[in-house]
């Protein structure tokens, strides 16, 4: 049975090809261990965030280079729907190569736009946008963890 048979044609058609591909074949799913980070001369950052509204949760792993604060690698584990997996996967990809201060500027809109097939067509149906918000929130949590500050202080910056 195909995913289309399970989800139903009309709803399934509201997802971009990129979202469908990332649901089925996420590129950055996994974890970074302490020894992996050490090989990159990086600090390991692990942050968790959950969306109580739907029961989805994501754990984000960053390997942050000690001297430059550049995110050398990013991985995630996600518990939830396919949209949460796709959003988490794209979010991890967007973080790689950025400094922590640059990564915290990634918004849920950036994540959603990166999943689009066409610039003017949303990647997911409106009722699934909260998944990209969860990706945004876990980036803020990882940044706060790395900097040793309360997440609320990042909203004030």
What are these regions (language model features)?
Residues 1-28, 34, 38, 46-47, ...:
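C-terminal binding/interaction regions
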Residues 52-54, 63-132:
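Active-site- and interface-proximal helix/loop "cap" or "latch" segments in soluble metabolic
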Residues 25-71:
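Structured beta-strand/loop patches that form or line metal/cofactor-binding pockets in enzymes
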Residues 59, 68, 91-92, 140, ...:
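Low-complexity, compositionally biased segments
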């Amino acid at each position: 049975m195909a995913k289309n048979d399970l989800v139903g044609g009309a709803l399934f058609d509201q997802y971009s090809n990129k979202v469908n591909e990332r649901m089925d074949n996420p590129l950055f799913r996994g974890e970074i261990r302490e020894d992996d980070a050490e090989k990159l001369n990086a600090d390991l950052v692990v942050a968790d965030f959950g969306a109580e509204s739907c029961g989805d949760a994501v754990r984000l792993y960053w390997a942050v280079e000690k001297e430059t604060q550049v995110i050398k690698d990013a991985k995630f584990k996600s518990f939830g729907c396919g949209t949460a997996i796709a959003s988490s996967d794209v979010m991890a990809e967007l973080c790689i190569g950025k400094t922590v201060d640059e990564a915290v500027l990634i918004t849920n809109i950036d994540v959603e736009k990166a999943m689009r097939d066409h610039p003017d067509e949303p990647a997911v149906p409106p009722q699934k946008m909260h998944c990209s918000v969860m990706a945004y929130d876990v980036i803020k949590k990882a940044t706060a963890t790395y900097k040793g500050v309360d997440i609320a202080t990042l909203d004030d910056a």
